[in-house]
C-alpha cells in the first residue's frame, strides 16, 4: 500500500510503459508450429503391389499420389533414411536398391515414381512372397546398414497367392529384427490375415496395420510416419512490420493499415487498426426563414351563368326522288369475221427409208425368210392452192343457225376424188409427158429438139443411141439403168414417191402439175433364186455338222458300255464281294436289275 501511495513509483512505471510502446515497432512477431523431423538412421523397404486387381484408374488416382506423399514427408539422405523399392505382381521387380541410384536422393525417387506412373499398368497376380524374399536377400548380403532400423511397409489391395509361404518369410524377417507394416486399400483386403502377418491379435489395436478405401490412402500414411519420425515444436519469425498508413478520415473515427513481407505460411501479412485524428467541427445551423405575410385580396363574386336557349328542331328532309331506270343498252354489232389465212405451201415429201437387208441367221437355227417390202401407198393428189377456201358467214344474233344445204358445196369438206390441176393455156410443162406403155412419142413435143431444154429420146439405131455419141453414160429420162449389185432397190430412191403427211392427213407435192403415178419396182426373179440358193447352202452346212456330232455321241456311248461290261466281269473273277444291295445307295435299290444293265437300243443313238 505504501508503494501505491508513493508518487515516484507511479512515475517509474509510466516511463517503462512509454518506452515499451515506443520500441514496439522494432519487435518481430514469432509463431510456434510443430513439424515431423526424421533424424534417425532407418533403412525403409517399400513393397508396392502392382497386380491387375488394382486397376489403371486407382493406380493413377490413388497409388501414385500415396507413394509420392510418403517420399515427400521423409528426410531422405545418406546419413538418415535410405530407401529400397520393389514392385511385385506375378514376379518381383526391384526398382530401387540400397546404396544405389535413388536410395539417398529425394529428387531421384520422384523421377522414378513419375516413370512408373507413365510406363506401367497394373497386371498379373499378387506374388508377395517373392518381394519378401528380395528383402531377405539384401539383409543376408549385408547391403543394409548395421546400426539402422529395418522397416518394411507393404502397400497392397488383396490377398497374396500363397498365404503359408508369405507368413513363413515374414517370421524369418522378424527374427532378424525387421519390423513389418501393412497398408491395406480397397474392398478385397483380408484384414484377419494382415493382422496376423504383422504380429497382431485378432482383437485390439494394431499399430502396424491400417486399412481403408482408396480415398483414405494418403491419410493412412501418417501413422506410419510416426514410426520413423518424431514431431518437433519450432518457432518461425514473421518479419518486421512497415509504418502505419494515414488514417482513412481527416476527422472523427477511421482505420489505418500496415503491411510486411510474409516469411512463413502461418504469418499474417497485413494488419488494420482503428484511428481518430480529431473531432469534426459542428456544422453551422442555418437561421430559420420567416415567411412574409401577403395581404389577402378580396375575391370578386362570380356572376351566375344564364341558361342557354333550347335549339330549334331541324326540319325533316324531303324524300329523294326515285332514280329513272336506265335505258337498255343497244345490242353490240356482231364482229366482222376475220379474213381466212392463206394456206401454207405444201412441204416436200420426205424420202422413204431404204429397206434394211435381211440379217444372216445365226447357227444352228434356220434363217427366217425375209418379208417382202410392202408397197407404199399411192399418194393422193394435193388440193389446188390457187382456189382459196371461202370463209363461212357469221351467224346472225337475232335468228337461229340455218341448216346447211347439201347441194351447196362446203369448202371444209374435202372431196373423195382429187381435183385436177389447172394448167394455164399456152404454158409449156416443166417436164415432158412420158408415155406409160407405148413407144409412141407424145404430141406435145416441140418440132425441133433444139427448142426444148430437155433432151427427148429418139429411135435407137442397132441398139445405140445416135444422139449420145460423146458420153455414153449421159442421163436420158427413159433409159433403164440395171442395178450394179444384188440389191434391187439401190438407185430407186428417186423413182419411189416420197409422200409427206400433213395434219389434215392429205399428201401434197411440190409440183402440182405432175399427175404421173410412180410405182416401185418389183424384185426380179434372179434375186429370189440367189437368195434360195444361199439358204440351201446354209441348211446343208447345219446337216453336216449335226451328223458329225451324232457320230461322236455314238462312239462315246459304245466306249462307256464297253468299260462297264469289262469292269463287271473283272469284279466277278476277283471273288465274292459284298452284296450289291449293300453297296448301292438306298435311293437306287428300287431300280430293277434289267434297267441297271440295259444297253442302249438302236433308236437311242438318234
UniProtKB/Swiss-Prot annotation:
Disulfide bonds: none
Keyword Membrane assigned: yes
Domain VWFA: 43-228
Every TSP type-1 domain range: 235-281
Region called Disordered, residue ranges: 301-541
Disruption phenotype: Decreased sporozoite capacity to invade mosquito salivary glands. Decreased sporozoite capacity to infect host liver. Decreased sporozoite gliding motility in vitro. No significant effects on merozoite invasion and development of erythrocytic stages of the parasite. No significant effects on the levels of mature gametocytes and the ability of male gametocytes to exflagellate. No significant effects on sporozoite formation. Dispensable for sporozoite adhesion to human hepatoma HepG2 cells.
Signal peptide region: 1-24
Sequence ranges of Low complexity compositional bias: 409-425, 440-450, 459-479
Main location: membrane
Swiss-Prot/TrEMBL keywords: Cell membrane, Cytoplasm, Membrane, Signal, Transmembrane, Transmembrane helix
Pfam families: TSP_1 (PF00090), VWA (PF00092)
Transmembrane segments: 544-564
Coiled-coil positions: none
InterPro entries: ECM_Assembly_Org (IPR050525), TSP1_rpt (IPR000884), TSP1_rpt_sf (IPR036383), VWF_A (IPR002035), vWFA_dom_sf (IPR036465)
One GO cellular component term noted in the UniProt record for this chain: cytoplasm
Compartment annotation: Cell membrane; Cytoplasm
Highest taxon in the source lineage: Eukaryota
Keyword Cell membrane: yes
Membrane topology type: Single-pass membrane protein
Anything else known: Binds to human hepatoma HepG2 cells; binding is enhanced in the presence of divalent cations, such as Mn(2+) or Mg(2+).
Complex formation: Interacts (via integrin-like A-domain) with Anopheles gambiae saglin/SG1F; the interaction probably promotes sporozoite invasion of salivary gland. Interacts (via integrin-like A-domain) with human AHSG; the interaction promotes sporozoite invasion of hepatocytes and formation of exoerythrocytic forms of parasites in human hepatoma HepG2 cells.
Cited function: Promotes parasite ability to invade host hepatocytes. Promotes parasite ability to invade mosquito salivary glands. Required for sporozoite gliding motility.
Name the UniProt record assigns to this protein: Thrombospondin-related anonymous protein
Species the sequence originates in: Plasmodium berghei (strain Anka)
